[in-house]
């Protein structure tokens, strides 16, 4: 029986960046009724057993970091609370950090209040990216529904976590060229700085929230269709504009925002992949942020459109 898993590229990178981020992915889902805890436990256990990285400890070996598959119980993962203050319980749960050497790499909480359940989930970003998070939630929901209907648990999709899978859909010659890309190494003369300082004794986690109603997203999507911009362009432009104005960034200076690109587009369609990180870096560099948000969106759209046309889009900065 397999006892270890190889640490892939982004597993190690997220571990290294631990001095500047807490490495956690957090999500919550509010239900109209109450979640049946017994059914959820069966669903969580089935998903966890399908993906061994979820019950593994990261071992930072100086030559070959790896995951050690560990024993665990459902109590290591799930907590259930009945409360009159769901917001405080949620904040207490979400403000945790799962150590990389913990025996489980995600935790879930069911917070019951006034006949409704709030499902909070926190995962180690070393194990998976945003696209894989969708798969994770889908598989939990699928298993829960099957058990609720009295049906057997499904065989869940899983497979390789190997970083090299992102080249599997390319012809051999392109595969060689893509592996040799060094475009993430630049010779720009501007001063490059990292946005975060090292951890200090006075640091503490703080989660900033902004709730968007459906109508706001619908309006943004309609505006994107009308102008030819993507929703991602608009969200990125809003981030750049807000960051620049908040930090009093010099209006005449260029700035670069690093974004993540899903590289599953390059994976062979028939390939079976597990929960992992299959992303690349996209450097969105604009000469300056706009005098209006509309101007900034236009500048961002020009960059992203140009990058998407490149032969190895997403593979230059991994």
Q: Which positions does each model-derived feature cover?
A:
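Acyl-thioester-dependent acyl-group transfer interface
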Residues: 1-61, 84-106, 245-318
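Non-catalytic, low-complexity flexible loops and terminal extensions
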Residues: 1-10, 14-15, 127, 131-222
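Acyl-group handling in specialized metabolite and lipid biosynthesis
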Residues: 21-44, 67-89, 98, 124-128, ...
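Acyl activation and transfer enzymes in specialized metabolism, enriched
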Residues: 32-52, 121-138, 209-250
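Amphipathic alpha-helical recognition patches that constitute DNA-binding helices
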Residues: 39, 131-135, 156, 164-168, ...
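Acyl-thioester-dependent condensation/acyltransferase catalytic cores
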Residues: 41-131, 135-148
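Short alpha-helical linear motifs
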Residues: 64-66, 158-161, 257-261
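Secondary-structure boundary elements
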Residues: 112-116, 142-152, 226-232, 242-254
């Amino acid at each position: 029986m397999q006892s270890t898993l190889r640490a892939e590229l982004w597993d190690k990178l997220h571990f290294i960046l631990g001095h500047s981020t807490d490495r956690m992915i957090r999500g919550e889902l509010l239900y109209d009724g109450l979640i049946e805890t017994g059914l959820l436990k069966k669903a969580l256990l089935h998903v966890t057993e399908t993906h061994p990285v979820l019950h593994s400890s990261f071992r930072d070996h100086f030559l070959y970091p790896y995951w050690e598959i560990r024993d665990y119980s459902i109590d290591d993962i799930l907590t259930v609370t009945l409360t009159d203050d769901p917001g405080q319980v949620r904040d207490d749960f979400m403000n945790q950090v799962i150590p990389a050497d913990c025996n489980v790499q995600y935790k879930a909480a069911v917070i019951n209040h006034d006949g409704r359940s709030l499902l909070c989930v926190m995962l180690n970003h070393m194990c998976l990216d945003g696209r894989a998070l969708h798969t994770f939630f889908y598989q939990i929901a699928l298993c829960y529904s099957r058990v609720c209907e009295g049906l057997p648990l499904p065989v869940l999709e899983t497979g390789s976590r190997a970083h090299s899978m992102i080249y599997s859909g390319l012809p051999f010659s392109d595969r060689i060229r893509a592996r040799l890309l060094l475009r993430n190494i630049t010779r720009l003369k501007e001063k490059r700085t990292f946005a975060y300082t090292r951890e200090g004794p006075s640091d503490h986690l703080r989660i900033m929230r902004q709730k968007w109603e459906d109508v706001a997203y619908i309006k943004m999507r309609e505006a994107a269709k009308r102008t030819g911009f993507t929703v991602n362009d608009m969200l990125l432009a809003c981030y750049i504009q807000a960051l620049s104005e908040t930090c009093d960034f010099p209006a005449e200076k260029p700035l670069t925002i690093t974004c993540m690109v899903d590289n599953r587009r390059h994976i062979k369609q028939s390939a079976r992949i597990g929960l992992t990180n299959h992303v690349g870096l996209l450097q969105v560099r604009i000469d300056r942020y706009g005098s209006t948000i509309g101007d900034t969106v236009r500048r961002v759209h020009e960059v992203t459109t140009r990058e998407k046309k490149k032969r190895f889009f997403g593979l230059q900065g991994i």
